[in-house]
C-alpha cells in the first residue's frame, strides 16, 4: 500500500510570524503533501477550513491529535557536540573548565567507536528536544565530523576545532595536520563543513 498524497494533522500548533512573534492556532490543521523528498508542509489553518478543503480529495490520511501542540524545529547556531557530557560541570572560569573537564573528555574522541556511539546518542538527544539543524563543532578528530554528519538528522553544518596552540599536548595539532584535516573534510562535505 502506498503512502497517502496528503497527511493532515489535526492539532494545535505554533506558527512563527517573525523572530519575535508567533501565533498559536488552538484548533488547527497542518497539511503535509508527499514529494520526492518526503512530506512537506503544504497548507495550514483553522481545522474546519482545512478539513472542508481537503476531505474530499483522494489519498488523504487524517491524524487527530487534539491534545498535541506542534511547533517548528529548533536551530542551534553554535554548539560543541563533543562537550555534551561536560557542559554542566562547574565553570568558575573558562580555562579551568577546559583543563579540568573539556579537554580530557574531548581526548576520548580519538577512539572511533567511542565517537560513533556518542554521535548516535547525541543525535537522539537533539531529536528529543526538537533541534533539527545548526552550526556544530566536533573535536580535532576528523571522524568526529564524519559521525556527526552521518547521524544528526536535519540541516547541520559541522566543523572540527583546530588546536594548533594553547592546548594540551594530547590534543595539539601541527598546522600541517590541521590543514590536511580541513582539505579532506571540505572536499568530502563541501558546504556542510565549517572552518
How does the language model describe each region?
Residues 1-56:
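N-terminal metal-binding scaffold of metallo-dependent hydrolase/deaminase domains
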Residues 79, 137-138, 158-162:
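A cross-domain feature marking catalytic cores of carbohydrate-active enzymes
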Residues 85-115, 166-167:
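Active-site gating loops and adjacent loop-to-helix segments of metal-dependent hydrolytic enzymes
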Residues 143-195:
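Metal-coordinating catalytic core of metallo-dependent amide/deamination hydrolases
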Amino acid at each position: 500500500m502506498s503512502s497517502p498524497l496528503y497527511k493532515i494533522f489535526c492539532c494545535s500548533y505554533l506558527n512563527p510570524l517573525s523572530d519575535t512573534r508567533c501565533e498559536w492556532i488552538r484548533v488547527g490543521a497542518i497539511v503535509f503533501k508527499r514529494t520526492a523528498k518526503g512530506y512537506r508542509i503544504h497548507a495550514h489553518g483553522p481545522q474546519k477550513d482545512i478539513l472542508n478543503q481537503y476531505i474530499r480529495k483522494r489519498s488523504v490520511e487524517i491524524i487527530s491529535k487534539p491534545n498535541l501542540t506542534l511547533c517548528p524545529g529548533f536551530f542551534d547556531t553554535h554548539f560543541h557536540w563533543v562537550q555534551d557530557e561536560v557542559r554542566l560541570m562547574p565553570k568558575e572560569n573558562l580555562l579551568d573548565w577546559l583543563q579540568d573537564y573539556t579537554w580530557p573528555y574531548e581526548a576520548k574522541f580519538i577512539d572511533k567507536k567511542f565517537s560513533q556511539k556518542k554521535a548516535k546518542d547525541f543525535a537522539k538527544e537533539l531529536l528529543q528536544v526538537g533541534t533539527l539543524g545548526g552550526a556544530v563543532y566536533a573535536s580535532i578528530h576528523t571522524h568526529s565530523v564524519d559521525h556527526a554528519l552521518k547521524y544528526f538528522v536535519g540541516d547541520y553544518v559541522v566543523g572540527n576545532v583546530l588546536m594548533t596552540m594553547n592546548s594540551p599536548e594530547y590534543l595539539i595539532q601541527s598546522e600541517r595536520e590541521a590543514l590536511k584535516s580541513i582539505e579532506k573534510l571540505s572536499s568530502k562535505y563541501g558546504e556542510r563543513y565549517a572552518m
